[in-house]
Amino acid sequence: MSRHSNTPATDASVLLVQLSDSHLFAEDGARLLGMDTAHSLEKVVERVAREQPRIDLILATGDVSQDGSLDSYTRFRRLSAPLAAPLRWFAGNHDEREPMQRATEGSDLLEQIVDVGNWRVVLLDSSIPGAVPGYLEDDQLDLLRRAIDSAGERFLLVSFHHHPVPIGSDWMDPIGLRNPQALFDLLAPYPQLRCLLWGHIHQEFDRQRGPLRLLASPSTCVQFAPGSSDFTLDRLAPGYRWLRLHDDGRLETGISRVDDVVFEVDYDTAGY
């Protein structure tokens, strides 16, 4: 069953921050492809705190954990706490639902519908336990339909982990959302739908599909090279996406990356 809350906006617009694909571990100093993922998240959070003094909602868009441990999820909560803003998260293909739920107890972290300002944010679980690609099950599509139908005059942003459109990377496109047409068919009659936001691809993505803005964010750790045929790491730094959602339905967004730290990365790795 989905939960639903109203989060007061700070002014006539809404400021969201997307933190994606942090790939945290239980152990201090653990590394993914040579990068200390807790250290990189900490530096991204420090940058967010400097650049975004008032945040209405933080979205952690999947792959919060690399090892699926309870400690990795509590680590994320601890490292993101300095931002002092409402946080919601959902699972990616590397996450484990049971520890993620345990880390959520006593909070609204897994809440799937959040009304903030003149917008409704709907968060869906596209993960398939034990698999890399994604799929939106009927219960998630039904939740989305109900959320849209009950949104009134609000504009909508919908977020999940897996990419619903090709991104031009031969190795990544087969591991995106397996049933994107079901999603787009559901969304087609609703002009108040303004944005789809996802993670998974570890790179910036910004396209338009009719009235829909299609957006993805860099990872807070390692980056994947756009347009690559095989697994390839990019040399861009970790970062985050900010989104300003205006009451009239306009959306402004941008990417910011850590530019004052040199991170150690194993660029010769052929996968993970």
From Swiss-Prot:
Transmembrane regions listed in the UniProt entry: none
Keywords: cAMP, Hydrolase, Iron, Metal-binding, Nucleotide-binding
Activity regulation comment: Activated by iron. Other divalent metal ions have no effect.
Amino-acid positions noted as binding AMP in the UniProt annotation, renumbered to this chain: H23, D63, N93, H94, H202
Record-linked SUPFAM superfamilies: Metallo-dependent phosphatases (SSF56300)
Cofactor: a divalent metal cation
Binding site for Fe cation 2: D63, N93, H161, H200
Annotated positions binding Fe cation 1: D21, H23, D63, H202
Substrates-to-products reaction catalysed: 3',5'-cyclic AMP + H2O = AMP + H(+)
Coiled coil residues, start to end: none
GO MF annotation list: 3',5'-cyclic-AMP phosphodiesterase activity; metal ion binding; nucleotide binding
Entry note: cofactor: Binds 2 metal cations per subunit. Site 1 may preferentially bind Fe(3+) ions, while site 2 may have a preference for Fe(2+) ions.
Induction: Positively regulated by Vfr in response to elevated intracellular cAMP.
Record-listed E.C. numbers: 3.1.4.53
InterPro entries given in the database record: Calcineurin-like_PHP_ApaH (IPR004843), CNP_phosphodiesterase-III (IPR050884), GpdQ/CpdA-like (IPR026575), Metallo-depent_PP-like (IPR029052)
Pfam family, one: Metallophos
Superkingdom as given in the UniProt entry: Bacteria
Traits of the deletion mutant: Mutants show increased levels of cellular cAMP. In rich medium, mutants exhibit a significantly reduced growth rate compared to wild-type strain.
Family, as annotated: Belongs to the cyclic nucleotide phosphodiesterase class-III family.
Protein role: Hydrolyzes cAMP to 5'-AMP. Plays an important regulatory role in modulating the intracellular concentration of cAMP, thereby influencing cAMP-dependent processes. Specifically required for regulation of virulence factors. Can also hydrolyze cGMP, but cGMP is unlikely to be synthesized by P.aeruginosa and cAMP is probably the biologically relevant substrate for CpdA in vivo.
NCBIfam families in alphabetical order: PRK11148.1 (NF008359)
Subunit structure: Monomer.
Protein's name according to its UniProt entry: 3',5'-cyclic adenosine monophosphate phosphodiesterase CpdA
Organism field: Pseudomonas aeruginosa
